[in-house]
C-alpha cells in the first residue's frame, strides 16, 4: 500500500487514506443452485437501504414478500451491520457453504456479506459548481481540515446572508457568489446523515485496529471535531442540506438512480494529525483525503425458522449470490461492489465508484449492529450542544470507546 505523505444534496442532503489498485480479479467460482422451485412466501427483516434486494428477488421469482419490524420473527435478515440473535451457521449447509466460499468465508459464520459501497459526504455537482465554479468537488476532496472547516463555516454564514466571500481549498482560492444560485434549495450546509457508523473507519484505521483507549482516544477526538462541525451547520427540522453523509447504497434506496447520477463524493473529514496514529500503513493526510469503501451489510437466516421459512430464506440468499439477475440486484439495484469483486458501471454514479476504487480507497471496518447503534446514539447526544467544552469532548470520546468495546 502506497502511503500518502501529509500534512442533501439539496435533497435532504449527503475519501479517507489507504490506496487500492483496480478492482481485484473476480472470483469466478460458481455455486450449484438449488433445483427446487422458489418458495411462495418469504418473511424478511431488512434495513431501508437493503430492502430493494429483497424486493427484486420477490418480483423475479414470484414470491410473496412480507416485511417485518421484528428480527426474531423473520426467515431472512438483511441488515446494515452484523446482526445478533440465534442465526444459522451458513457453512453448515452445502449450498450456503459454497456461497460463503465465494465471499472468501471458509470457517463458521452466521452471515453472508452483501458487498461494499462508497461512503462520505455526497453533494450535487451542479450546486457545487454554481457556488464555487468548475473543479470545486476535486478541490474539496483534497482540502485539509483547516480549509474544510473554514469553508463550512463561511458557507453557513453565506447561506444566511449571501455576499461574495473567498475560501481556500487545496491551496487555491474560490469565491462564493454575491447572490444565491437558483439551483440551491438547501437550508443548511448538512442534512442528517443516513449512516453514522461508517464515519469511524478513519479512526479505527488510524488505531491500526487496536481497540484500546490509548490507541483510539486521539482519532476519536478527530471524529468529535467532525461531528460537532456537522451539527453546528445542519439544516433545521430535517431540512435539505448541500452535503449528506451516507453510503451510495443508502442514497440509491432513498432517491433512485436518476437523482444519484448527478452526485459527487467528498470525504467525511476528521481532524487528525500524525501524532494521533499508531498505524504504519496510513498517515493523516491519506485518512483525510481518500474515500471509504464501507461494508453495506449482510444476509442472515434465523436458526429457529420453520422448514418452509428456511427453504425460502436459502433460496433468496442463493439467488443473490449465484443467479445473474441476483448479482444485478446487488451491483445495479443496490450499487455495491460484491464480495467477489464485481461491480456495475452502467450509470454515472456507479461508474464513478468503480473508477474511485481503482484510484484509491480506505477499506471499510465491520461493526456489529449493537456497536453501530451505540455510536449513532452517542453522536445524537451532541445535537443540541451550543458550547463545545472539554468535558463534552471527553464524554463523547468515552461514549465512543464504550460503544466500540475498547479496553
Where are the predicted features?
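Conserved C-terminal helix/tail region of periplasmic/extracytoplasmic solute-binding proteins
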Residues: 338-407
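Extracytoplasmic/periplasmic substrate-binding proteins
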Residues: 200-307
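Conserved N-terminal structural module of periplasmic/extracytoplasmic solute-binding proteins
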Residues: 6-9, 13, 19-83, 329, ...
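Helix-loop-helix "hinge/cap" segment bordering the ligand-binding cleft or interdomain interface
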Residues: 67-70, 105-197, 208-235, 305
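Pocket-flanking alpha-helical
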Residues: 55, 69-111, 153-166, 250-257
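Hinge/lid segment of periplasmic solute-binding proteins
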Residues: 78-120, 126-129, 265-267, 274-286
